[in-house]
Amino acid sequence: MPMGAAERGAGPQSSAAPWAGSEKAAKRGPSKSWYPRAAASDVTCPTGGDGADPKPGPFGGGLALGPAPRGTMNNNFCRALVDRRPLGPPSCMQLGVMPPPRQAPLPPAEPLGNVPFLLYPGPAEPPYYDAYAGVFPYVPFPGAFGVYEYPFEPAFIQKRNERERQRVKCVNEGYARLRGHLPGALAEKRLSKVETLRAAIRYIKYLQELLSSAPDGSTPPASRGLPGTGPCPAPPATPRPDRPGDGEARAPSSLVPESSESSCFSPSPFLESEESWH
């Protein structure tokens, strides 16, 4: 059936009209009013298998949207959103955050060789002490494992204890020698250190008075004697030695008092103050 000119002109125009609008929209491209500018770090998603270049999408220039049917969502677009979603909770920062620094390792422990080894065993029974005496002959045990002679203590403690033992030993030896110079009864009696010093002071005073009262060899006065005695008889006159160190004046043992506490010594204020202590 022949068609009119109007119909021939309208037919192709009506069939091409729908495609004309889509071509104009494709040439116009996306509107720049609401699309953000693409950043260099935006996630890009490859298009479909056709290998076409990615096209700018609504989430940046790097986000590609492949051709998809109208009214549907592109799978690549969904995958890009999943890749951009943070893996941790919102309160955590995962991008650009360095891991916390590791704690510095602890300094190495001091070797056991530098640590002093202190051993203080308790008291042991005599059978155990006899058994260990043969095993440890180099350890001087003062008693049944009472207190060690510090074989395992530091050197400065051992030296300090040794000095203290030497000091006590010297003091005891000095008092023993002083008791030996006292008259017989006092030398044989067990005296304390204070009693030994007081008896030595009284004896020295007696010797000084004995020498000062008879400078020319005459007899000393009979009214004075050693403490605790009455008037002492005059000792036999003996010639004085040429040198004062050649002889030693000693009182007879019968004149020595029985007790060192009782004294009727010379009226020295020093001795009177000592006697007032009792």
From Swiss-Prot:
GO BP annotations listed: regulation of transcription by RNA polymerase II
Domain of life from the UniProt record: Eukaryota
GO cellular component, one term: RNA polymerase II transcription regulator complex
Biased segments, Pro residues type: 230-239
InterPro entries given in the database record: bHLH_dom, E-box_TF_Regulators, HLH_DNA-bd_sf
Boundaries of every bHLH domain copy: 155-207
Segments for region (Disordered): 1-66, 214-278
Main location: nucleus
Biased composition (Basic and acidic residues): 240-249
PANTHER family according to UniProt: BASIC HELIX-LOOP-HELIX TRANSCRIPTION FACTOR, TWIST, BHLH DOMAIN-CONTAINING PROTEIN
Name assigned to this protein: Achaete-scute homolog 5
Lineage: Eukaryota, Metazoa, Chordata, Craniata, Vertebrata
Gene: ASCL5
